[in-house]
Regions:
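Active-site nucleophile loop of the alpha/beta-hydrolase fold
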Residues: 141, 210-219
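Short beta-strand/loop motif that positions the catalytic acidic residue
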Residues: 258-260, 264
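Alpha/beta-hydrolase active-site loop
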Residues: 154-176, 197
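A domain-start/cap signature at the N-terminus of enzymes
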Residues: 1-105, 117-123, 131, 135, ...
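Active-site glycine-rich loops that stabilize anionic/oxyanionic intermediates
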Residues: 103, 111-115, 326
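Alpha/beta-hydrolase fold nucleophile elbow
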Residues: 177-189
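Cap/lid segment of the alpha/beta-hydrolase catalytic domain
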Residues: 140-160
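Short glycine-enriched nucleophile-adjacent loop
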Residues: 192-204
Length: 367
């Protein structure tokens, strides 16, 4: 057993070491390892677009779904040192959906070594979308940006993919007439790390966030510190990290649903506990010392899951779920897809049940 954990540690270290390498060099690695897929993602970069690239239906629509699977790309505002900033994505419109009908939107951020297709298949989010009546947006990291398709969740926010994802969400919601009061965000691992950044830095776009196997916010500024955070959580007070990064008094708050595997050897469960405290802080349930200022904290266990709930006026604001026997994988997912497990409850269904009770009002308050 120790040898297995050590192997996971070095594999994780290798991933994060690659993350810190200069991005232009990634093109060489992509051509050697996966030329066909890289071409599919990188080709649109040579074609300018006003809002998004030419959409097309296809590219492995998730099995068992009856809606429309659209593949395209978005031209986000350029970042420093990057004249072109294209972001590939998949959009799923549930069966019977009509343009401008005010559907809710769930934004899904995949993890390392995943694609929009694999994440949709593993979480079964599109099948749920058909039943529940929401659209699904799956941004996809390019191999030209990271050889393992990891999102850059640590370090300088402006150099991460967060601004591009925020721009994509705005463009898609505007183009399809989605309900801006019901836009939700979810991610796993590196995708959960980026989702935390978006919820903290771009809170007005999202009514709630779901984080699966994600690192604590604001603790990592480099490759090596990111690896340490994943393995151990933050050595600093997580509440102090939030206060140092944000004006908590001006933050509108974002309800959060957090899922973590008990035996995750890649992202330690302490991260989930600390994330719970951070989101309780921005929702103003905790004070600057991390003490409960309003509401209550409830704990209970059911069906091999330990729950910690932050409740205010009888309303669930933050929930942390630790799934017994689960490693670094999506709970209750399709085990045929990497980083998904059939162990534990269906995390996507649990997140949606939480999401559907949250709305972002026009007054920028949660109702």
């Amino acid at each position: 057993m120790p040898r297995k954990k050590t192997s996971v540690w070095f594999k994780g270290l290798e991933l994060l070491t690659r993350m810190s390498a200069p991005r232009p060099k990634k093109k060489v690695a992509v051509r050697k390892t996966a030329p066909a897929k890289a071409a599919q993602v990188a080709r649109p970069a040579a074609k300018p677009a006003k809002r998004a690239g030419k959409a097309h239906v296809g590219r492995a629509q998730p099995a068992g779904t009856a809606g429309r699977w659209i593949r395209s790309y978005h031209s986000a505002p350029p970042r420093a040192g990057h004249l072109v900033n294209h972001l590939a994505y998949a959009l799923y419109l549930p069966a019977g959906a009509a343009r401008g009908t005010g559907l809710p939107l769930v934004v899904m951020l995949h993890g390392c070594k995943q694609t929009a297709e694999s994440f949709a298949a593993g979480t079964r989010v599109c099948r749920l979308a058909d039943r529940a009546g929401f659209a699904v947006l799956l941004p996809e990291q390019a191999k030209t940006a990271h050889a393992q398709r990891c999102w850059h969740w640590h370090g300088d926010h402006a150099q991460s993919e967060a601004p591009a994802v925020a721009s994509l969400v705005d463009a898609i919601a505007r183009e399809h007439g989605f309900d801006r009061e019901r836009v939700y965000l979810a991610g796993i691992s590196a995708g959960a790390g980026l989702a935390s950044v978006l919820a903290m830095r771009h809170p007005l776009r999202f009514a709630a966030v779901g984080l699966h196997s994600g690192p604590v916010f604001g603790a990592a500024s480099s490759t090596m510190t990111a690896m340490s955070v994943m393995r151990h959580g933050s050595r600093e007070d997580p509440v102090h990290l939030v206060d140092a990064a944000l004006d908590v008094a001006a933050h509108p708050g974002v309800p959060a649903f957090i899922v973590q595997g008990e035996i995750d050897a890649v992202v330690a469960r302490r991260n989930a506990v600390q994330l719970g405290m951070q989101f309780a802080r921005i929702n103003r349930l905790l004070d600057a010392q991390g003490e409960l200022r309003v509401g209550e904290i409830r704990t209970h266990s059911r069906d091999a899951v330990a729950y910690t709930d932050y409740v205010k006026s009888g309303r669930l604001v933050v929930r942390v779920c630790v799934v017994r026997g689960l490693g670094h994988a999506w709970s209750g997912g399709d085990p045929r897809e990497a980083f998904h497990s059939d162990r534990g409850p269906d995390a996507m269904a649990m997140m949606w049940q939480f999401f559907r009770r949250q709305h972002r009002s026009a007054a920028d308050e949660m109702v």
